[in-house]
Amino acid sequence: MRPGRLRLLVGLGNPGSKYVGTRHNIGFMALDKLAAQKSVSFRPQTKFHGLMAEVAVGSERVRLLMPQTYMNESGRAIRAAIDWFGLEVDQLLVLVDDMDLSLGRLRLRAQGSAGGHNGLRSAIQHLGTQDFCRLRIGIGAPGCTSEERRARTVSHVLGVFSRQESLLVDQVLDEVLMGLDLIQCLGLERAGNRLNAFQPEGCSAC
């Protein structure tokens, strides 16, 4: 993504009060924080199957989208917004949780597979390509073995952050918001050099 190219920022998550603050919804949490920082509110947009707001990122206006389709159908909302606004896929950035990354770590990528994430799988299916930018936000994995991970995945991603974890999440989301400005001003590669090396204070497990 070239500097100034970002036009659509999508946070992945599940709708409803039941899922507020859960690990799977950290993409929503990032957009909520950005909207609060910019003093804007999300409004329902049925044609996009989601909630939408608009903010300035760098010197450009960027639309924020939180699909309300549930995670497995996120791609429907993304496709609808891309088509309605006449955007190219390289103007899109998706914010998504990642169990393969420790809590506190970030990975900015220009493309890639779904990596087992149903929201990304839906986006790839509806966009017809995996060549779109995504910022993976680490939420850590449950357990120490593959068996424990499989058994506890659902409860982990649908669980809320502990009080101590929430302190790290605050730092991470601040870095994400700073990173969005870097992406818009400097482009994906230079922004990624910083974001991918980020480590929050007090995070020995990162």
From Swiss-Prot:
Site (Stabilizes the basic form of H active site to accept a proton): 97
GO biological process, one term: protein quality control for misfolded or incompletely synthesized proteins
Residue numbers binding tRNA: 19, 70, 72, 118
SUPFAM superfamilies given in the database record: Peptidyl-tRNA hydrolase-like
Known EC number: 3.1.1.29
PROSITE patterns: PEPT_TRNA_HYDROL_1 (PS01195)
Translocase recorded as keyword: no
Catalysed conversion reaction: an N-acyl-L-alpha-aminoacyl-tRNA + H2O = an N-acyl-L-amino acid + a tRNA + H(+)
Compartments it resides in: Cytoplasm
GO cellular component: cytoplasm
Residues at the catalytic site: 24 (proton acceptor)
Site label Discriminates between blocked and unblocked aminoacyl-tRNA, positions: 14
GO molecular function: peptidyl-tRNA hydrolase activity; tRNA binding
Domain of life: Bacteria
HAMAP family (UniProt xref): Pept_tRNA_hydro_bact
Protein name: Peptidyl-tRNA hydrolase
Organism from which the protein derives: Prochlorococcus marinus (strain MIT 9313)
Gene assigned in the entry: pth
